[in-house]
C-alpha cells in the first residue's frame, strides 16, 4: 500500500492476473494525446470511476453528489500547478466547471462513439 492509502492492505481489490486494468476512455485519451507534443495534467471532475453495480469496467454518468465531491480537488490542482488552459472532456465536465466558475473549453467525450470527434475537436483548441 502506498503510504497506507492504496493497495490490498487499504481494502482495494487488485487485478487478479497482476496486470493493471485499461479503462476504455483513458486508453482513447492517452492514444490521442500521445500523438501530440504536449503533456497535460489530467483530472476527472468526478474523482472516482462511476460504474454500474457489480460491473467495474462499465461506465455510467456520475451522480450530482459524486461530481460535487470532486470540486475541491479540481480547485486544489488548479491552484497547485500553473494551469494555462482548462479543457473539459465532455458535457458533464464542462457543466461542472462552468457551475464552479472555472473557464474551460469543452470537447466531445470519447466514449459511446465519440473517439473521432474528440480527437478532431481537441486538435482545434487554440493555445495548446
Predicted segment positions?
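A polyanion-binding, active-site-adjacent surface
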Residues: 1-85, 95-100, 105, 112
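Short, flexible loop segments at boundaries between secondary-structure elements
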Residues: 101-128
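Alpha-helix/helix-capping structural signal
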Residues: 91-92
Amino acid at each position: 500500500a502506498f503510504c497506507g492509502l492504496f493497495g490490498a492492505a487499504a481494502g482495494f481489490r487488485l487485478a487478479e492476473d497482476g496486470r493493471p486494468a485499461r479503462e476504455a476512455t483513458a486508453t482513447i485519451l492517452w492514444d490521442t494525446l500521445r500523438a501530440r507534443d504536449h503533456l497535460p495534467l489530467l483530472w476527472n471532475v468526478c474523482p472516482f470511476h462511476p460504474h454500474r453495480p457489480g460491473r467495474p469496467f462499465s461506465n455510467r454518468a456520475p451522480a450530482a453528489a459524486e461530481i460535487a465531491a470532486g470540486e475541491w480537488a479540481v480547485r486544489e490542482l488548479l491552484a497547485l500547478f500553473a494551469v494555462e488552459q482548462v479543457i473539459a472532456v465532455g458535457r458533464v465536465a464542462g457543466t461542472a466547471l462552468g457551475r464552479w466558475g472555472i473557464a474551460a473549453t469543452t470537447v466531445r467525450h470519447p466514449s459511446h462513439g465519440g473517439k473521432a470527434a474528440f480527437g478532431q475537436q481537441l486538435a482545434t483548441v487554440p493555445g495548446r
